Amino acid sequence: MLNEKEKSNDHNDWLKNSIKDEYLSYYDYSNFEITKTIGFGNFGKVLRANLKDTDTIFALKSFNIKFALKDIVNEIKLHRHVDIHQNILRFHGITWMESETFHRSYSLVLQYADSGTLETYLTEHFNELDWNDKHQLAFQLASAVECIHNLDIIHCDLQRI
């Protein structure tokens, strides 16, 4: 049976090999300009980040220190698994930042939703939407949830809208 250090090394090896084999894209953290915090959750926080010298904007999903590398690797695998659905944010890769204590802080590089969260969008635009628009949004949300459930994935952090 593997001890915790060996398990951590397995996950480090999986990340290194996934990047080397081009299963995952790696983005150097120094190539991002963080412009603002756009959300918080049980996992950590989400930052809006511009890729320097481009017009590309991403969302960087960071993780609280309580998350083990195995949890981050699992989330990456889940994102890769559901990257087939048009109403689920695209997963672009991974980045990390090294601290002075050589602790590596990982972030997922995700598609940036320029309208913000669905909750924010509905709060700001609900009265402007006709019933067809509202029906379409509900259908898209239900379709995305159905997709992940068909893959035996439970979201665990859906918010009340």
For the regions a language model picked out, list residue spans one by one.
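Catalytic-loop of the protein kinase fold
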Residues: 149-161
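Conserved short submotifs of the Hanks-type protein kinase catalytic core
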Residues: 102-117
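Short beta-strand micro-motifs within the conserved protein kinase catalytic domain, predominantly
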Residues: 90-106
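Activation segment of protein kinase catalytic domains, centered on the conserved DFG
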Residues: 124-139
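Protein kinase glycine-rich loop
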Residues: 35-46
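Juxta-kinase regulatory segment immediately upstream of eukaryotic protein kinase catalytic domains
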Residues: 1-26
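The N-lobe alphaC helix and its flanking beta3-alphaC-beta4 segment of protein kinase-like domains
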Residues: 64-86
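Glycine-rich ATP phosphate-binding loop
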Residues: 45-64
